[in-house]
Every structure is written in C-alpha cells, then in structure tokens.
Amino acid sequence: MANFYPDFLNMQPPPNYVAGLGRGATGFTTRSDLGPAQELPSQESIKAAIEQRKSEIEEEEDIDPRYQDPDNEVALFATAPYDHEDEEADKIYQSVEEHLSKRRKSQREKQEQLQKEKYEKENPKVSSQFADLKRGLSTLTDEDWNNIPEPGDLTRKKRTKQPRRERFYATSDFVLASARNENQAISNFAVDTQAGTETPDMNGTKTNFVEIGAARDKVLGIKLAQASSNLTSPSTIDPKGYLTSLNSMVPKNANDLGDIRKARKLLQSVIETNPKHASGWVAAARLEEVANKLSQAQSLILKGCENCSRSEDVWLEAIRLHPAAEAKVIIANAVKKLPKSVTLWLEAEKLENQAQHKKRIIKKALEFNPTSVSLWKEAVNLEEEVDNARILLARAVELIPMSIDLWLALARLETYENAKKVLNKARQTIRTSHEVWIAAARLEEQQGNVSRVEKIMARGVSELQATGGMLQRDQWLSEAEKCETEGAVITAQAIINTCLGVGLDEEDQFDTWLDDAQSFIARKCIDCARAVFAFSLRVYPKSEKLWLRAVELEKLYGTTESVCSILEKAVESCPKAEILWLLYAKERKNVNDIAGARNILGRAFEYNSNSEEIWLAAVRIEFVNNENERARKLLARARIESGTERIWTKSISLERILDEKDRALQLLENALKIYPHYDKLYMMKGQIFEDKEQIELARDAYLAGTKVCPYSIPLWLLLAKLEEKQSVIRARVVFDRAKVKNPKNEFLWLELIKMELRAGNISQVRAALAKALQECPSSGLLWTEAIWLEPRAQRKTRATDALRKCEGNAHLLCTIARMLWLEKKADKARSWFLKAVKADQDNGDVWCWFYKYSLEAGNEDQQKEVLTSFETADPHHGYFWPSITKDIKNSRKTPQELLHLAINVL
C-alpha cells in the first residue's frame, strides 16, 4: 500500500492565513513596516535644494581661505614681484629671528632639561625601574638560561585540552605494513612508466637514473651559484658592504668550527672571484689567524700582496702577521711598490731599532714624499742636535710653507730675534692663522715684555678679522684655557681681554661673562676666571654682584693680600654697598688688624651713616677686643642715628652679657615703647626675669608677648618651657593654644613630642607624631624624630619613607648619614654628610655632626677640610646650633670654639 504525503507546501494558502497563528506564534511590527512618520519631500524640492547647495559651494570656493583669518598674512603678496629689496628684507627678518632664538638659549635649555628630568622622575620608564635587576642578569651562565622553564598555558580551556594533545598511541603493525606496500607500489609504478630508465650493467647491477638526475641537478645549482657572482649586470648587493659583512663573520675565537668553515668558504669564493680586492685577502688572513693557523694566514696574505700590490692595507697586514726579520723584507718590497705611501715608510722606521737606520729610512722617504708633514716631524724628532733639527725645519718650511706646525716648531728652536723673524714670515705666508699670533704673544711673555703681549693680540685680532681668519668667541676662550694650562698666563689674559666681547649683544654680555667665569672656575682655570672678572668689572664697575663673585674667587684661590686688594677697589667703585665694606673689615679683623678694620668701618660710615649692619660690625669689633665702653658708646650713638630693632636688641644683649640686668630692663622698657610688636623684646624680657628667678614676671612677659605677637613661634616655645618646669599639663595647654594660632608648624609639634618624651608618655608621643606627620609631611625634623623612635631594625624602612616625602632636606640627610655611621659604613656616611651640607650650608646642626664624624672616623686632611668649609659657610641656623651661638655665655667665642663646644654637647 502506497504512503500518502500531503502536498500542502506547494499549495496556495487559504485567505488571511498567518503562519504559526494556530500555535500562538504571533509576529510584531516595526517602524520600517509602517513607513516614515513624515511625508518625504517631492522630487522638485530635492532638486532645488541640490542646486542651491552647489551655488553656495562655488561661492565658498571663490573666496581664498587665507583671507578668512585677519591674523593670517601668509602669501598676501604672492603675486607681487620679488626684487632685491624684498630678498634683503627677508634676510634681515631671518637674522632677527635667529638672534631672538639664541637669546637666553642656555637658560632655556637648562629649564627644559630640568622639566624633562622632573617628568622622568615623576613618570619613570619601566626599563629604568628595573635597570638594577637587568644588571644582575649579566651574572647568569648559559646553563642558568637553559634551565629556565618554559611558560605554561594557564587558561582553563586550553589546560583541559593540553593532555589530549600530548596523548600518544602505538601505531599498529597493519598500518605500517600498508604504508610500506603503498610506497613500494608507487616507486614500481614510477620505474615501470619510464621505459629504459634502468639499464642492466654487464655485471648484472642496475643503473638508477633517478639518483643520477638528482645529483646532476645539485651540481648545476652549485655552478649557477658560482656564476651569479661573475655577472656584470647591476646587482642589489653592494660589493663593499658584502665584504664588510664577510669581515663581520670572522669569529671571535677558534671554538666555533662550523662558523670558521662557513666563513672560510665564503672568503675563498671572494678571493677567487675577485683576486684584486684587498679586503677579501685581509679578511681571509685574519680568519686563519683566529683559527690558530698562522702559517696559512701568512701564505694567504703574501698571495694578497702579489695580487694587490697597490694596496696599503694588504702590506700592513702582512707586516703585522710576520716576525720582525721577515717583516723588514716585506716592507722593503712594499715601499718599492708604493714609494708615495707615508704610512708604509713610517712602519718601516718603526721596525728598525737603531737611530741611524731610522734616520736613513726617513731621509729616503723624504726623497719620495718631500711635502709630508708627518715625515718631517719624525725626522726632526730623531735628531739629537738642535742645530740639525733647526736645519731640517728650515728646509721643511721651504717645501711646505702652509704647515703652521712646522713654522711654530722652527720658532721654538730659534733665538728670540730669529724667532720673531720666523713668526713674521709665517704670518705673511699664512695670513689666516691665529696660532702665529698666539705664539708671538707667548714669545714676548717669555722675554718678560708683558706690555707688548696685549698689543700683539689686539693687532692679531684686527688682522684676522680683515683676512677672514677670525675664530669664534668660544674658540678664543679655549685657546686662552690652553695657554693657561701650558703656563702662558699673561697670554691667556690678553686673549680674554681682546676677545671676550666678540659677537655678544650688550644686553646678554653680563650673564654670559658670569657663565664664562664660572665655567673657567669649574675647569680650574683660575687666572682665566680672574681675567674675565677684571674685564667685566671694567665694563660694569658699579655691579655689586660682580665684585662679590670676584672676592669669592680670591677667597678660595688667592691670598689675604689679593682679597684686600680687590675689596679696596670694590669699595671705591661701590661705596654704598654695605656688604663690601663688611667683608673688607672682616678680612682685616681676621688677620688681627683691628686698627685697619676700624679705619675701614669709619670710611664706611661716611657713605652709609644709617647702616644697621655697619654699626653692628663696629660694635662687634670693639666687643671682641674687650672694649666694652667703646661698644656701649657706639650702640648709644647707633640708637640715636639709626635706632632699628636689631640695634636695640644688641644694646640689651650687651648689658645682659655684662651682667647689667637693671640697665637691660630699662632699655627694654624704652624699646617696647618704640617697637611694641617686636617679639624678641618680650623674649629677652622674660629671659632676664628667668635669670633673676622671677618666674611670675617672666610668665607675664611671655604672655604679653603672645598676645601682641601670636605668630611668634620662639615666644610660644619659651612660654611652654617655662610652664613645663611647673607642670606638663600647663605646658600642653600652651602648645594647644599655639597650634590654634599657628597650625601645621613643625617646631611646635617637635617640641611637644620632645616634652612628652621627657615626661615618659610614649603613647602620647606616638599619637602626636602620627598627627604631626599628617599635618607636616615634608618636615625633615619630624621625620628625623620618627626614625630615631623606631627600633634599629626598622629605621632603614622609615628612612626610605621619609626620603619619598622630603627628599633633599638637610636634617633628614644628616640623619641617614648618622645611621650609616652607626652601622660602621664610614665611606657611605661621609657621602651622605656631604649631601647634607650641600643641601643647606647655613644649617649649623649638619656641620656639627659632620665635624664630629670626621673627628672619630676621618683622617686629619678630612678634618681640616670640614673645618675650612665650616668657616667659609659661617652657618647661623638650625635646630640645635642657635642655642649654642646665642647663649650669652658664648658671646666672645670664635666659630671654631663654638663648633667644638657644640659637638661636646651633642
């Protein structure tokens, strides 16, 4: 019975039929089924809009875009004729732009460098972060590298598939037999289809023509490869570059035999295909030398000499590879083939041991090369007699008149009069040579004619400008530096006086000259720096900055007389500069010339009658020399004529030192009427009452001061210390009031922490320190206290955190140095102490610790160096140092005595 399949798929559906509706699969309608919500524009309106847009675009294209921007003037006159005046104007504008770009170039480059370093420091590269780890990789051996495990695939998906990929099964014998039979059938089929490919031999063996064809193809490929090197058509391989690459293939040692064989074949191919190429022979010989086959290397290089007899390199290589006896024979053949080669003649001279033979070779060389400067110099050097050398040089300058070295050498061997003639002749021959003029100036300096040196240099510069041989300014300064290093100081100064202002604008020359002097000082050319300052001061005699720099230079590298000499000139040029008078008086006082110091300050009063510093300097001189009455009279006069706050405080301090407390209090009352808001007056008043053990009056003085001067930190600290003697609780109240008036102040927090430490409140100390570091994260004093509060094992970590917060703080750097010192790392400690004093030379605390370290861990030279640097720096600030210097008991002590006192108290 046949099955019936309904053919409804090919039938027409009934009306209103919706597929799937019977099973509830209803469809949905989108906006695209309904059509657009708005009516589309008509074809006419679309065409009209397109035409209108085309007309707008054409109008926009008619307007040149460069006329749209009123600030853009590019090509406004492009259609105008370009004549000579326009070209000259463009050159002028170009020169102006170049000049503007050169101005402040060094400052601009320095600023850009600082910004770059700051950016690199804030955004370090990954390579720089791991630089120290990379250096450690150099210690790994090849075995360590080979033992590094391969990275595994740790993804979950591939980790599950990995065992399946690495699962192996043994192949069945049936598969192997089938594969063997299949290969045999294919080979039989290939043999049968080629009629006559195998011919039986007379002895019954068969000839395999398939193998013969494969061998023939291999031989043909080798021949084609060899023939390709002889092609005359253009090639993409550069022959010189190819030989260079062959040289680079020479192995560094004889261990890699495979590379040696490969390089030997390549180089053999090179010298066979192109036997006239010298580099191939040299490379082949060096390869054999590296392979420890010296005889083969010698044989190869001799063949190279036969094939490339016009090549210097091949002959020089042959000389190098052979012993001295054989090398002499080779060099003899070489100079016969290349008699014009100066290098070969000089090499022949080196092979000789006796001076007579050397001279003979050089003379023979000069017959073929009479214009070789190197040969003439060698001939002169070989002569032991000055007269013979002079004769040779005279002949040399006749043959080579443009060699300035030969002229100068001849002038050095002549007498003074003859040397002048030689230099004049050299000047006439080589009119663009500056060396001749410098040599003439040095000749006059050697004869003691100092006045003629600068005249010669001035004339030389003018003639060089006329003949086009004028050097750049920097080149002249280099010549001056060279003269100083060779002992010609007067000539160096003459060069600077003549050429320092060459090519400089008036507005740039001041800063440029300061930079020149600083660069000379950095290179230890002190006389050149002196000459720069002397020239600059002639141009700017009223510049206080220049005089101070010159005085500083003399204090470092000159004598007391030279310092006083330049200070005398300075005060004559700048009589209103207080600092110059003070330095001058101090220099005289340092050499115990008290009368001279008084005389200098007396002269200073004539120009600076109201100068506070000069008054106080005069008082200091009298006080140090125990002239107390004269000091009182000077201060009384100063209070009338100047009457500044410092003069009043010095007057009160003098009375305190002399133990005249009542007179000091009387002066204080008078001073407070004039300066009621000067905090030091209240501090001194409280201290006087403390000395008199009148605690209540001292407290009243401090309280009155804090009301009038609430932002004076030392005043609050004195009040807190006074209250601490009575009660720690009252001192805390003082600190709280002070912190309200002066938030985020490191000194208040530090004294509070130290007070709690003295009271033994460790928990309070740690809480206060944590809050202090939150308010003052860049305080070196607070970080120092935090480091010393940590156990010894954790101090290094704490110091690392501190360096991130306040790098460059002198207190912190000194603390790190002390830590290293405690760990017996003396050299590292010294380097950190040097960093600390460099960060802040006015910090007396750092100098105290540095000197104490030098006394215990340094040698005598280091101690003297620290002491000298301390006296030069003359520090006045710090946390601990002012308590030593401002103590009235130490008022008459010298800085060295104060330093020794401080390190004993530390």
From Swiss-Prot:
Localization: Nucleus
Keyword Phosphoprotein: yes
Gene Ontology BP terms: mRNA cis splicing, via spliceosome; mRNA splicing, via spliceosome; spliceosomal tri-snRNP complex assembly
Alphabetically ordered keywords of this record: mRNA processing, mRNA splicing, Nucleus, Phosphoprotein, Repeat
Substitution effect: P875L: In zer1-C5; temperature-sensitive growth arrest showing G0 state like terminal phenotype
GO CC terms in record: catalytic step 2 spliceosome; nucleus; U4/U6 x U5 tri-snRNP complex
Bias (Basic and acidic residues): 108-124
Protein function: Involved in pre-mRNA splicing. Interacts with prp6 and prp13. May also be involved in the regulation of the G0-G1/G2 transition. Required for pre-spliceosome formation, which is the first step of pre-mRNA splicing. This protein is associated with snRNP U5. Has a role in branch site-3' splice site selection. Associates with the branch site-3' splice 3'-exon region.
Subunit comment: Interacts with brr2 and spp42.
Name of this protein: Pre-mRNA-splicing factor prp1
Protein species of origin: Schizosaccharomyces pombe (strain 972 / ATCC 24843) (Fission yeast)
Lineage: Eukaryota, Fungi, Dikarya, Ascomycota, Taphrinomycotina
